[in-house]
Structures are given as structure tokens and as C-alpha cells.
């Protein structure tokens, strides 16, 4: 953990690079080892957000370490700079998951 789920209507050319870069960013923002960051990207989706211009929805889950008010701007800027999606067309959901509800390596964290 953390887990980053990126859904966008934009077509992303270098998916592996984008996943690597957003993993690095979220690792830095949460002070969690990049080794434990998992990221998923679904691009070129049919999405609607007031109209059909490109948009993006990010879901970020973690056991603690989330500071939505501090993380929203750098993540939005990343999406704008790397994906070309304006900040006003981005939603981000931050979800703090209890340790007892998150499992890795056959065991929960709490």
C-alpha cells in the first residue's frame, strides 16, 4: 500500500512510464516505500464530465499517511503536466483504509 487507481478518457502513449512516475510521486507524498506502492491505469475510457473533453478520476487508498489537502495539488499538477488534462477536469478520492482491512503476503496489517 498505497494503491493508486487512475481512470481517464485520455489515450496514454507510455503507460509504464506514467505508472512509474505516479508511483514515485505518491510514495514521496505518503512517505511510504515505493516498493509497496501499487498503481493501475485504465486509459481511453468512455467518460463524461459535463462534456466529452478528456477527464481523469484517481482513487488513492492507503493505511494512514494520507493528507488530502496537501496531496491534491501536486497530484493534480502531475495529471495536467503528464496527461494534459486540466485541473478542473480531475477528481481525486482519498481513502484511508483500516489496517485490519488491508492484506499483503497472506496477512492483514492490523
Language-model segments: what does each one mean?
Residues 1-110:
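Interaction-mediating elements
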Amino acid at each position: 500500500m498505497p494503491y493508486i487507481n487512475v481512470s481517464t478518457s485520455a489515450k496514454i502513449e507510455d503507460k509504464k512510464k506514467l505508472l512509474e512516475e505516479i508511483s514515485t510521486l505518491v510514495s514521496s507524498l505518503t512517505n511510504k516505500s515505493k516498493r509497496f506502492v501499487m498503481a493501475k491505469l485504465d486509459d481511453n475510457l468512455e467518460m463524461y464530465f459535463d462534456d466529452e473533453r478528456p477527464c481523469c478520476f484517481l482513487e488513492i487508498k492507503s493505511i494512514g499517511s494520507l493528507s488530502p489537502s496537501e496531496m491534491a495539488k501536486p497530484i493534480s499538477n502531475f495529471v495536467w503536466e503528464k496527461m494534459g488534462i486540466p485541473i478542473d477536469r480531475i477528481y481525486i478520492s482519498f481513502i484511508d483504509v483500516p489496517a485490519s482491512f488491508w492484506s499483503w503476503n497472506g496477512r492483514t496489517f492490523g
